[in-house]
Curated annotation (Swiss-Prot):
Keywords noted in UniProt: Amino-acid biosynthesis, Cytoplasm, Diaminopimelate biosynthesis, Lysine biosynthesis, NAD, NADP, Oxidoreductase
Species this chain originates from: Corynebacterium glutamicum (strain R)
Name of the protein described by the UniProt record: 4-hydroxy-tetrahydrodipicolinate reductase
GO cellular component: cytosol
Described purpose of this protein according to its UniProt entry: Catalyzes the conversion of 4-hydroxy-tetrahydrodipicolinate (HTPA) to tetrahydrodipicolinate.
Gene name tied to this protein: dapB
Length: 248
């Protein structure tokens, strides 16, 4: 028997992709497909060991509290996690030594590598800005991926003892310089025809570096999600970022 998996948000586009990926995996067993009107108790009744959550920021915290209290580990792709929410998840996990929660801003391996490479490059360049581009139905802006990328860049700059990046702007239309995430400008584009894309632009004297990532289809998330499902038993507690499961 394989790992027993429940999918929350199973009727959504990403959820349907994850359901198909689990069904195609010999070492996983899909035991629950939970939609917005379904009772979470189905997870317990069907013996789910791990859930995958691609729901909404409004629903995810209640889902996590239920899963943790019932000893079910969770792989979470839902966005909207700030420091306060992460601290709440840690509090729920206290004393739950056999429960793991993986929260990742992006499960596409190319996006994870973009975040890692950006953090590595940050100390070599005076300036850095992040541009994320998504379909117009995305509920949050900027994306969790862009925020996580900018936070990593800012942390690397701080560790290297770098000053604030140069910007002589004195007058600007509101929002034209993007949102500041720990001092790194982040710009969000919402456009028909897009799925999920990110560009990180670095600059210093006489040269620039652009790291670009594109997800053209929601299937790009499935391999990373399955890495999380298969390995979460070895990672009790809260882990933020799939890179920690990939040895990066």
């Amino acid at each position: 028997m394989g790992i027993k998996v429940g999918v929350l948000g199973a009727k959504g586009r990403v959820g349907q992709t994850i359901v198909a990926a689990v069904n195609e995996s010999d070492d996983l067993e899909l035991v629950a497909e939970i939609g917005v009107d379904d009772d979470l108790s189905l997870l317990v009744d069907n013996g789910a060991e791990v859930v995958v959550d691609f729901t909404t920021p409004n629903a995810v915290m209640g889902n996590l509290e239920f899963c943790i209290n019932n000893g079910i580990s969770a792989v979470v792709g839902t966005t909207g996690f700030d420091d306060a929410r992460l601290e709440q998840v840690r509090a729920w996990l206290e004393g739950k030594d056999n429960v793991g929660v993986l929260i990742a801003p992006n499960f596409a391996i190319s996006a994870v590598l973009t975040m890692v490479f950006s953090k590595q490059a940050a100390r070599f360049f005076e300036s850095a800005e992040v541009i994320e581009l998504h379909h117009p139905n995305k509920l949050d802006a900027p994306s969790g991926t862009a925020i996580h990328t900018a936070q990593g860049i800012a942390a690397a700059r701080k560790e290297a003892g770098m000053d604030a990046q140069p910007d002589a702007t004195e007058q600007a239309l509101e929002g034209s310089r993007g949102a500041s995430v720990d001092g790194i400008p982040v710009h969000a584009v919402r456009m028909s025809g897009m799925v999920a894309h990110e560009q990180v632009i670095f600059g210093t004297q006489g040269q620039t570096l652009t790291i670009k990532q594109d997800s053209y289809d929601r299937n790009s998330f499935a391999p990373g999600v399955l890495v999380g499902v298969r390995n979460i038993a070895q990672h009790p507690g809260l882990v933020v970022g799939l890179e920690h499961y990939l040895g990066l």
